Amino acid sequence: MNHPDYVVRTRATCILVDFGGEDKIPHIAQVLKNDDNELVRHEAAFSLGQMSYSSTIPPLIDSTLNDPSMFVRHEAAIALGVVGSKEAKETLQKALNDPDKPVVESAVIALSNIEFMETLSKNEKFAKLTGG
C-alpha cells in the first residue's frame, strides 16, 4: 500500500476486496484516509462500498464530509448509499450542502438508494407476515 506507483496502490486496494473479509477494512480505510493520490482514495471508497460491512461506515462518513477532493467525496457518498444506515443517512443529509454539485447529486442518489432498500425491506417483512 506504500508503493510509489499509484496504479499499483490502486490495484492492491482492489485485490484486498477480492480476498474479502472484514479484516481487510482497516487497510483500505487507511488508504482512503492517507493516500496522496485522489484516484487511489476514490477506489478505496468504491471498494469499501462494495464490501458493504457496517464497519466501512465511519471511514466513508469521514471522507464524504472531509476529503479535500470532490472526486473522493462523491464516491464516498455513493458508497454510503450502498452500505446504508442511520448514520449514513445523516451524513448524506449533510452532504446535500457540499459546495460541489457532483457531491450533492451523489448524496441525492445515495439517499434514494437507501430509501429504496428500506422500502424493499419493509415489503419483504410485510410479505412474510401476511404469507404473501
Question: Can you say where each PLM-predicted feature lies in the sequence?
Answer:
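Amphipathic alpha-helical scaffolding segments comprising HEAT/armadillo-like alpha-solenoid repeats
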Residues: 2, 21-33, 53-65, 85-97, ...
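Short inter-helical turns and helix N-cap capping residues of alpha-solenoid HEAT/ARM repeat scaffolds
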Residues: 4-5, 36-37, 68-69, 99-100
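Structural detector for internal amphipathic alpha-helices that build alpha-solenoid repeat scaffolds
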Residues: 6-21, 30, 39-53, 62, ...
